[in-house]
Amino acid sequence: MYIEITIDLKNYQQDSFDIRLSNYYSVKKLIDIVWQAKNMTEQPRQGAWIRVVNKQKIIQGTERLLDAGIRTGDRIEIL
């Protein structure tokens, strides 16, 4: 299933943006897709951690978005 989420890149001095992708991707793959979409030169921090802002939940890079409970409308901050 596809989900639509907001990605917050404030930790990397970038604006937030909306993206639509499969919830079967891992958090690490989500970060890879974001880096490609935004053509970012700065490397992501080690561990591929994210925070679901509206659920106050921190998730590691190996979890799938589906298993982590990420749904359409969530706001994701890449740590």
Language-model segments: which ranges?
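Short structural boundary motif marking the start of a folded domain
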Residues: M1-I5
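Short, acidic/hydrophobic/Gly-rich beta-strand patch recurrent on exposed beta strands
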Residues: T6-D8, R20, W49-V53
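Short, contiguous acidic and Ser/Thr-rich linear segments
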Residues: K10-K29
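Short acidic beta-strand-loop surface patches of small beta-rich interaction domains
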Residues: Y12-Q14, R45-L66
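Short beta-strand/loop turn elements enriched in aromatics
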Residues: K29-G47, Q56
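Loop/turn positions that initiate beta-strands
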Residues: G73-I76
